[in-house]
Amino acid sequence: MNLSSNDQPSQGRIKAKDWSTDLCECWMDINSCCLTCWCPCVAFGRIAEVVDRGSTSCGVSGAMYMIIFMLTGYGGSSLYSCFYRTKLRAQYNLKERPCCDCCVHFCCEPCALCQEYRQLQHNRDLDLVIGWHGNMERHARLAASTPSAPPLQAPMSRLV
């Protein structure tokens, strides 16, 4: 087994985790597969909104992706989206697999977007359709509705 430098934890760093699914396992979630193949700007916009933690909207990111694609072709949009893959990996401590992020996006943009979408949706319990802010509200509602354990009482003692 040949370990690259990305697999070995450095001092004080936690070892990077594997992706939940492989790059070419698009069939694992047919809905995200269809979305990334037929509407990559929408898939990218949703990914970017979550990776940016709501600082950019799905619409703005998706429009930027489409404009870059229309002006530069496949290469420009792949370059733009590969930076978000790098950001996503850093946030969730994921391995750089199967090769460097830009190569993954240049060689197979739809598969890369689909893998990122699956990672966020299924392994981070995020609904990419409702965006970052919608997910934060949903998680806050769930936390508020979860009953907490009653406080522990001191044991009873007898007065003699």
Swiss-Prot record:
<comment type="function">
    <text>May be involved in heavy metals transport.</text>
</comment>
<feature type="transmembrane region" description="Helical">
    <location>
        <begin position="62"/>
        <end position="84"/>
    </location>
</feature>
<protein>
    <recommendedName>
        <fullName>Protein PLANT CADMIUM RESISTANCE 11</fullName>
    </recommendedName>
</protein>
<keyword id="KW-0472">Membrane</keyword>
<dbReference type="GO" id="GO:0016020">
    <property type="term" value="C:membrane"/>
</dbReference>
<dbReference type="Pfam" id="PF04749">
    <property type="entry name" value="PLAC8"/>
</dbReference>
<dbReference type="InterPro" id="IPR006461">
    <property type="entry name" value="PLAC_motif_containing"/>
</dbReference>
<keyword id="KW-0812">Transmembrane</keyword>
<dbReference type="GO" id="GO:0048235">
    <property type="term" value="P:pollen sperm cell differentiation"/>
</dbReference>
<comment type="similarity">
    <text>Belongs to the cornifelin family.</text>
</comment>
<keyword id="KW-1133">Transmembrane helix</keyword>
